[in-house]
Design a protein with these regions (language model features):
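C-terminal regulatory/interaction regions
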Residues: 150, 172, 176-270
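Short, well-ordered alpha-helical microsegments
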Residues: 22, 63, 85-86, 140-145, ...
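His/Asp/Glu-rich metal-coordinating catalytic cores
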Residues: 1-12, 19-132, 139, 150
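Binuclear metal-ion centers of metallo-dependent hydrolases, dominated by the metallo-beta-lactamase
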Residues: 91-94, 108-185, 254-270
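Short loop/helix-cap segments at secondary-structure boundaries that form the rim of catalytic
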Residues: 5-10, 21-28, 39-46, 92-95, ...
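Short internal beta-strands
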Residues: 28-38, 101, 153-164, 217, ...
Length: 270
């Protein structure tokens, strides 16, 4: 039996490396991508049983969907997914299944076109001053580092972000290193976890360094508009339109919604 991000089952399927989707492995065998298994469990995944297939989920690096063949039909589970591609990240594959379990994090929302958001973000980077970008260390930080590198910017990052960025061969400087200390003498761009970044933090840093400091959020969550100086809806989830498009392309016999606005999304699909 396979536990879909559950404490039950002989096998544990972990779709990606975000903490809200990970469970204790204990003595179970693990089904996941190499990236997820190494980051979360410090081991290689086990070979999946016959009848199990993994697919790209388009959410973050190493994110996977799964299908499981049973006597009653094929079960598909998306985990978190993003159908459309974005900077350096392929979109989710359309899986073939009879019973679909799909996330619904942004089932009520509509994201602006990624190209427009990306272009606005690029323009923001040209502003004068120190720029502190709030991004989750797993997934979002890798995406933002890719964009910064494309713009010729090498960001200062935490040790964890630096370690994870190695999987994508990205360019960054670790905070606290001699190189970062030299960068701190002028304008620079840094990526920090969201819990460490807010306007009060920026004000204190600005006073200490006598430099203009801008905080930048890169999330589709509405609270980012008041927490940061700038906020860009760079989302690693599908919005309502994409979720519906995904369901239509899969065309399963039965749909189960989970994570987020699951009841709302279920009623929308009826």
């Amino acid at each position: 039996m396979v536990g879909l991000e559950s404490k039950y089952g002989d096998y544990l399927f972990t779709s990606h490396a975000h903490s809200d989707h990970t469970k204790k492995l204990k003595t179970r065998k693990l089904i996941s991508s190499n990236f997820t298994s190494e980051i979360i469990y410090n081991k290689q995944p086990d070979p999946p049983p016959k009848g199990i297939t993994l697919y790209n989920a388009g959410h973050i690096i190493g994110s996977k969907q799964i299908t499981i063949n049973t006597e009653q039909g094929r079960i598909g589970y998306t985990g978190d997914l993003r159908l459309s591609p974005r900077f350096g990240i392929k979109g989710a594959e359309i899986i073939d299944c009879d019973y679909l379990i799909i996330e619904s994090t942004y089932a009520r929302s509509t994201h602006p076109p990624y190209e427009e958001v990306y272009e606005s973000f690029r323009k923001c980077l040209k502003n004068k001053g120190i720029k502190i970008i709030a991004a989750y260390e797993v997934g979002k930080a890798q995406e933002i580092t890719k964009i910064l590198n494309e713009e010729g910017i090498t960001p200062i990052v935490t040790e964890k972000i630096n370690r994870l960025n190695q999987y994508d061969n990205l360019d960054q400087v670790v905070a606290g290193s001699d190189e970062s200390k030299d960068m701190l003498k002028g304008e620079y761009v840094a990526i920090l976890p969201p819990k460490k970044v807010n306007r009060e933090f920026a004000t204190n840093l600005s006073v200490a360094l006598n430099e203009k400091v801008l905080t930048i959020g890169v999330t589709a969550q509405p609270w980012a508009l008041w927490k940061y100086d700038y906020a860009f809806a760079i989302s690693d989830h599908s919005d309502q339109r994409e979720l519906i498009e995904y369901v239509e392309q899969v065309n399963p016999e039965m749909i189960l919604t989970t994570h987020g606005d699951d009841i709302y999304f279920a009623n929308l699909l009826r």
